[in-house]
Amino acid sequence: MADISFSLHAEQTLESLLERMSEFDALADLDMDIIDGVLTLEFDDGGKLILNRQEAASQIWLASPEGPAHFGYDADRDAWLNDRTGESLTDTLNRVLSAGCGETIRL
């Protein structure tokens, strides 16, 4: 993926995720924002979820209470996929967010 295309696609993905997360009542009171391409969410227990784009690797990186994960874009599946497990970014976030807020989250 070309650098400009990656940057734009990654930024749009982060903005879309923030918008979708904001729609859930269970997440509404949590501190969430995007600053300089880094999406940060802090759970009530102090745990954090951080998503940011890594230009050099053309990936979105996730740091969460589960540990780190790296996601590359698969155009054929139109999804960001974990480079080790193949799990989608959305499925990973559903699990991490559900565990963090104690309610089922489906982005």
UniProtKB/Swiss-Prot annotation:
GO terms for cellular component: cytoplasm. GO terms for biological process: intracellular iron ion homeostasis; iron-sulfur cluster assembly. It holds the Pfam family Frataxin_Cyay. One of its GO terms (molecular function) is 2 iron, 2 sulfur cluster binding. It comes from the Bacteria. Keywords: Iron, Metal-binding. Coiled coil: none annotated. Belongs to the frataxin family. This is Iron-sulfur cluster assembly protein CyaY.
